[in-house]
């Protein structure tokens, strides 16, 4: 439900809110809906300050993949993440990753069903592509076949995260509690490609100052507020916050394109 999957540590709160607002605008214009589940599969850690922002933006659930199980061995894949001022979201961490290998979904799903056989409801993420979600014909055929084969013992449906969380809440009312940032993850990203980080912070501050000055100019002198120009700058800022751009985990070409 966001504009993109950003780094969730370095951007300030205003930037996170801008990201959410752009995502809201897209989903409302294209689909006429406003999601209540936020998804940041691949972000390298998550600041606890996000919880309050998520709540105030209308999200009550969150799907992540990092930090991985080896780094944060939580009791369960679903847990209650508590933030500031009494805020909280129900989080699902997918330990099976967020995408699948072309032509392997049938076998992967069978293993997933075996691993989660004691759960009343579970969430399996599949699809090709950098962040999954791209169903191939061969995998869809295999999944359809498996749905028919296992119909007598369990129900497999194509669905969405909101539906999963609704079923999960109906089946389970208490969860392990986490009251801290989901960090550290990939610590090298905190210092890698520092030029991107410096330019990002500069642009963040310049946009905030520019908005204030433009508002004052309109109120005091009738100068037209440069809405489109500022929006273009905001989109550039959000692009730079992508979780492989701002952290510096991309190639040199990515760094140059971001700059």
Q: What do these predicted ranges mean?
A:
Residues 1-259:
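Catalytic-domain carbohydrate-binding cleft regions of carbohydrate-active enzymes
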């Amino acid at each position: 439900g966001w504009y993109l999957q950003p780094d969730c540590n370095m951007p300030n709160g205003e930037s996170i809110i801008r990201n959410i607002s752009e995502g809201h605008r897209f989903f409302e214009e294209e689909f006429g809906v406003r999601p209540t589940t936020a998804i940041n599969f691949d972000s390298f850690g998550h600041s606890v300050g996000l919880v309050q922002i998520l709540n105030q933006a209308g999200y009550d659930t969150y799907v992540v993949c990092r930090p991985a199980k080896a780094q944060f061995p939580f009791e369960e894949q679903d847990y209650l993440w508590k933030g500031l001022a009494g805020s909280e979201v129900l989080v699902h961490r997918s330990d099976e990753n967020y995408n699948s290998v072309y032509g392997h979904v049938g076998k992967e799903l069978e293993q997933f069903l075996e691993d989660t056989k004691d759960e009343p409801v579970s969430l399996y993420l599949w699809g090709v592509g950098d962040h999954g979600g791209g169903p191939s014909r061969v995998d869809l055929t295999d999944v359809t076949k498996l749905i028919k084969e296992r119909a007598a013992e369990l129900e497999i449906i194509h669905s969405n995260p909101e539906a999963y969380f609704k079923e999960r809440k109906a089946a389970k009312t208490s969860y392990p509690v986490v009251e801290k940032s989901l960090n550290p993850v990939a610590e090298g990203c905190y210092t890698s490609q520092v030029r991107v980080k410096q330019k990002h912070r500069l642009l963040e501050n310049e946009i905030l100052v520019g908005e204030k000055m433009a508002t004052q100019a309109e109120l005091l002198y009738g100068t037209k507020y440069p809405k489109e120009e500022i929006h273009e700058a905001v989109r550039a800022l959000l692009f730079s916050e992508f979780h492989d751009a701002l952290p510096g985990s991309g190639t040199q070409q990515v760094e140059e394109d971001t700059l």
